[in-house]
Amino acid sequence: MIHYLRYCCAMFFALISFLLAPPQRAQAQTREAYVSRSANGTTLTFYYDDQRATRTGKSWGIEETKKEGGVASPAWAEKWHGEDRITTRVVFDASFRDFRPTTTAMWFSNFTVLRKIGGLEHLNTSEVKDMSWMFYGCSGLTSLDLSHFNTQNVTDMSWMFSGCWGLTSLDLLHFNTQNVTKMWAMFSGCSGLTSLDLSHFNTQNVTNMSNMFYACSGLNSLDLSHFNTQNVTDMREMFSGCSGLTSLDLSSFNTQNVTEMHYMFSGCWGLTSLDLSHFNTQNVTEMHYMFYGCSGLTSLDLSSFNTQNVTEMHYMFSGCSGLTSLDVSNFNTQNVTRMHSMFFDCSALTTINSNTAWQCPESEDMFARCTQLKGAVAYDENKTDVTMADPETGYFTAKPTAVESVRFGADDAQHIYTLQGKRVRGEWKHLPAGVYVVNGKKTVKP
């Protein structure tokens, strides 16, 4: 009995000693997420283990950052505005699958010579909220397998693939974008992509789509017919430089909250038609360069445009050399302060319909190189500012109403007058082209 009691006491004290002992062993085995650069500097490996001290080469904790110019970037990455011209390979070790990062922003930003990312299936993104700038400038990548990415909690995908011009394809069919609010410049500069299937993208919460497809010159088609843009406020440069697009279906676009549309289609010279008849532009303030260089367009229906809040229209149609006529009779330009070069180099344009004269403080070269333009007066290369934006004394052509059109008959010859009030004899069909007063209304005779 005594021996048994002694045994129990010994076990009791042993247990107490174990419980009170410093947790040195546990501390030594604590895992951490870190990035290690190989001795030759060309490979970055992501680990989540307790072996950091044994790794050769420099290493950084996964949450270590450096700040420059107010911008924080991962400690292992290059300066946010510089380039990493050393790293050719990135590897995610199998141990990393147990780690749950909350951000992958700028992880490989400007890794311009990166050729391969291995083990991406070990990157668990289920808790990631920010993927902005993740692969920005990775121009050396020719393929990218993101099939294991869980994006259900991501809110920011801006600049995510920007500058990845080496990619020829990108499979994002499994991406869950229901919580994403920022997609600006997401694919900008991906000039190697020839197709992009975004048919499953949920964009109901996106507010910014500016530069989203900027300079995606390799795309020849883009189906956005399912896009929900009800909350988008910024569409500037959205398709700018998409010179390969021959058609673009934007019939699903709700633009009621958009305030910026400048450069939206600039450089889309492959487009031959563009249906914007449903566009609501009541809140848009900037439209400069909107159709700049769209030389393939032969017609453009802007009848739905509400321009009452627009302040800038300079270069809006500049370089639209395929247009022969343009109806802007519904344009309200009372708040526009800049119209310079608005129709510059619209070399095939013969008619601009508008029933009102425009005024604007900045309007030099507004009609420069519009040599075919015919309005109330003949085109004069020395008169190309806003003073010629007039249906009575300039290059504008008044648009007759339906009521006026039905009255243009021989029986109404006695009701036709010149703008100076002189009565015109003869039938309407035999009169020379010009602006007349018919039954008390200004009417154009083409």
What kind of feature is each model-predicted range?
Residues 1-7:
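N-terminal secretory signal peptides that target proteins for export/translocation
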Residues 435-446:
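C-terminal tail/sorting-segment detector
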